A protein has these predicted regions:
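Mid-domain, small-residue-enriched loop/turn segments at the edges of structured enzyme/sensor domains
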Residues: 1-76, 81
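Domain-terminus/edge residues, biased toward the C-terminal soluble/receptor-binding domains
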Residues: 41-42, 53-175
Length: 175
């Protein structure tokens, strides 16, 4: 959920390398809402780039499935989403060194999507997407799986671990 990437996208979209981080979030959020509308996600409105709770920030499972499908249609994003881990500076090349509105650092990152990692909840057909948690939304996951050339998206809200992994597996098996 790297806000530094949202800032880089906003700066590129507006062709404004001097944009403040606060303005970046407004621009990126506007872009999110426009893209959601283009995808037919009519029961969603985004109020921030990070996903934390706001009364004006909401979605539904159908809309997240539409967004997840579009995400996975982007081959670069799909490759990133199925990675179990990453080490390096995730913002390298995205922001200029003199841009003091964005702080970067090296990361050792591991996926929180237990469907793609090598543990107890691994699902061999899982190919990504994104986990989340807030007190209001509980444990969530938008997950993708592919088997026999068919790709499915499962969206789980208001769950608790380990149920979100088991529910996603069950939805994939049902589908």
């Amino acid at each position: 959920s790297a806000n530094v990437v949202a800032a880089a996208v906003a700066k590129k979209a507006e062709n404004d390398e001097n944009m403040t981080f606060g303005k970046c979030e407004v621009v990126f959020t506007d872009l999110m809402n426009k893209k959601a509308e283009e995808l037919g996600a009519t029961n969603s409105h985004f109020a921030n780039a990070h996903g934390y709770h706001s009364d004006d920030h909401y979605t539904c499972a159908h809309d997240l499935a539409l967004i997840g499908r579009a995400f996975m249609e982007n081959k670069t994003l799909a490759e990133i989403a199925k990675e179990k881990s990453y080490s390096g500076n995730g913002a390298e090349g995205l922001v200029k060194a003199e841009d003091t509105s964005v702080k970067t650092q090296d990361y050792n990152w591991r996926s929180h999507n237990l469907l793609i990692t090598d543990g107890e909840y691994n699902y061999p057909y899982a190919i990504g997407i994104k986990t989340g948690f807030t007190d209001e939304a509980g444990d969530c996951v938008t997950a993708a799986a592919e088997k026999d050339g068919e790709e499915l998206i499962a969206v789980i809200f208001k769950s608790e671990d380990p149920n979100r992994w088991l529910d996603a597996k069950n939805l994939f098996e049902y589908g």
